């Protein structure tokens, strides 16, 4: 009997232990609330208004909130706007640095400005991040870890690949809510929180932030019904939620900040976190340890809103592309000149030129959705950068060409190929000659004769075409020799062009109507 009672007691203890484990309180669902004051660099106003009013409102209002509310954390993106704070509001800028060191003013977005990510080249997007991170390191001793683009008009499949290879771990936006139609089943986005895999398999975390202009009226957010509902939209039992202002900068309302403070201390069913824009991403690191995270492969694009911007303001897009190409060519030539000990690398000039035009890749600037007045500033900056890049390219090529072996029998001509692959094409060149030549012959660096044609001679200048071949990011020397007679005379009449091989007849429209050999 005693043995029976002892066994029963042991069973009760085991059951009691199991019961105690099952009655442990469940973890509360989390609400990551992210304070922001998204500021359009240009839109319905120009950059002068941004600096004079919106940048000032942003730094001054948030400094007041940071002093008054100890749990308040503010997130702000765009290195160029921090540079304007430093230049125009230096006292407030120095005060802001203290809160950055404390982790309460958070550098979001990693980039020089919150750029469009569909029109710019991959090189530009990487430069944008590189320039932003460089500024943050030099000024604040920190780096950002996320892509923070609340207001762009769509996101290509290359973005997670670019971000991951730049050392970033996450991306957030609210713009997909602006779609007219569902994109993924009944939703406008694949999930509210998950992993976005890029074209090469690299992944970053994605969080949907909902409306960036959200306000609360001095309530306890730990009991907020909307946040409780939003956290059910993901099996992760949490919500990532922007609050603050959009477009004009400034700060969240006092009522909103008080609501967050009350929520942090509240006893409701939600755990409220006054979060940096990247805290959610850091909490899930490393991602390989979280198989519960859904994964998406593909693009995150808009369907109606903003889509027309990719064909508007064509001049702006032309200048931008010219700067991308000229900047790349200038960089290549400058690096080569330094490598050959012919010139010092003009790092500050190139950095200034990149910064000047890249901030105009902002999502309301390059895209063509700003007021006409704004583009007077944009075009001016684009042309200044083009001139800076052109000067670096020209001086670098000249310094290299000056050391090349150009000892030829005739007139030497150096051709430069700025592209990253070999080019064989017809090159038009101009040389100085004392008199009009009757014929020309052109030889390459190996002494091989190449096809050439004299186009024109006037005012001591001869224009000619050369069938040229130039290596990738390289140079080629050609030897141009003149002769007293043409090797292959050409007779030109009203409608015919004839030499010893061909006779071509043109019709009234200038089209070839016959070709005889």
Show the residue positions of the predicted features.
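Beta-strand-rich N-terminal accessory domains
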Residues: 481-517
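Residue-level marker of intrinsically disordered, low-complexity segments enriched
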Residues: 3-6, 10, 478, 488-490, ...
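Glycine-centered coil/turn sites that cap beta-strands in beta-rich domains
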Residues: 425-433
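Compositionally biased non-globular segments, especially hydrophobic aliphatic-rich helices
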Residues: 9-14, 333, 430, 439, ...
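Generic detector of low-complexity/intrinsically disordered segments
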Residues: 9, 14-16, 435, 456, ...
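Bacterial Sec-dependent N-terminal signal peptides
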Residues: 1-24
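Solvent-exposed residues in well-ordered beta-strands and their adjoining turns
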Residues: 432, 469, 481-483
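Catalytic-domain carbohydrate-binding cleft regions of carbohydrate-active enzymes
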Residues: 21-418, 425, 437-455, 459-476, ...
